[in-house]
Amino acid sequence: MINDILNEADGKMDKSVEATREEFAAIRAGRVNPSMFNKIVVDYYGSPTPLQQLASFTAPEARIILIAPYDQGAMHNILKAIRDSDLGVNPADDGKVIRCVFPELTEERRKEYIKISRHKAEEGRVAVRNLRRTAKQHLERLEKDGEVGQDDLTGAEKRLDGLTKKHTDAIDEMLKHKEAELLEV
C-alpha cells in the first residue's frame, strides 16, 4: 500500500516537473524555438486547433521562424492567432509560408522573462508540494485505519519528503539553467 502511494506520487511529481520544463521551453531565450508556439490555438473551420497540427516549423536563423501551413486556407486564421498571442511578433506571409522575425532581446525583456521563469518554477514547486500533501494524507489515512504502524508511516513520510526534495531540486536546476540562458548575450 505504502509503495503504491509513493509510486503514484513520484509519477505525478515527474509529470509536474515535465510540465514545468515545457513551460520553460516556451520562454524565449537567445534563439527562437518552435515550442514557443505550443500554446497557440487557431480557429480552424470553427474548431479550436493547436497550431502544431496545422503547420510545420523551421528556424533558418536564430531570430526567424518560418511556418508552413498544411492547408493554405488556414493562413489567415494562423496569422490572426499569432498576432493575438503574447509572443510580441508581427507575422508576415508571402502566400505560402508565414515568416515571424523576433526582435533582439533587450535587457528589460530578458529581466521580464526571468521573472516569468521564476513564476513558472514556483508554480511547479507548488504543484509538487500539493502532490506531497495529498500523498501524506493518504498515508495518514492508512495509519488511522490501522493498516500500517507508526514506524512504517514515519519511514514512508521520510521517503515522500525525499521524493519532494528530488523534484523541487530538479525544478530549481531547470530554473538556474533558464536564467543563465536568458542572461547570455
UniProtKB/Swiss-Prot annotation:
Q: Which GO terms describe its biological process?
A: translational termination
Which HAMAP family did the record assign?
Answer: RRF (MF_00040)
Its job: Responsible for the release of ribosomes from messenger RNA at the termination of protein biosynthesis. May increase the efficiency of translation by recycling ribosomes from one round of translation to another.
Give the Gene Ontology MF terms in alphabetical order: ribosomal large subunit binding
Alphabetical UniProt keywords: Cytoplasm, Protein biosynthesis
Task: Give the UniProt family note.
Answer: Belongs to the RRF family.
Check the record and name the NCBIfam families matching this protein: frr
UniProt-recorded name of the protein:
Ribosome-recycling factor
Its domain of life reads: Bacteria
Its gene name is: frr
What SUPFAM superfamilies does its record include? Answer: Ribosome recycling factor, RRF
Span of the secretion signal? none
- Location(s), subcellular: Cytoplasm
A single GO cellular-component term on record: cytoplasm
**Species name:** Nocardioides sp. (strain ATCC BAA-499 / JS614)
